[in-house]
Amino acid sequence: MHRIAVLTEQETRVAQMEEQIARFCKEKGRFPRIEPYRNQESFFNAVLTAAFSHAVIALPGVAGLNAVEHLRALCPACRIIWCSDLDFSLHAFRLRVDYFLLEPVTEEGFRRGLLVWLEGRTSIAPFLFDSNNH
């Protein structure tokens, strides 16, 4: 069974992302275990216990960059969607992030990231960047 971690400091945001992931997965006939985290300490303790198959990192600024770098070091095979208020798209490419979203994240943009996971694209697939400036 897939384990999807959602790491964000905002309580309302973690609930929204959990709901979006659950709805998307249900539509596709998948039922992963979704685990919310509101701080990096508890998130990384969970990673050390048992690696996640997928993770959404939605932290501001350098905190997000540090979390993605640390997660990639601990769990090289983890599939990652990274949401940031700063344009770290080059870092995301270097860190083999599956999908990078620049804030503000739209439901449509987040869904595209989830589709990348579902389609099983590898880290060598063309890098996807969503600026949400449509």
PLM regions: where:
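CheY-like receiver
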Residues: E107, R111-H134
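Non-catalytic signal-transmission and effector/linker regions of two-component phosphorelay proteins
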Residues: M1-A5, E9, A15-E18, I124-H134
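A short, hydrophobic beta-strand element within the central beta-sheet of small alpha/beta folds
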Residues: V56-I57, A77-D87
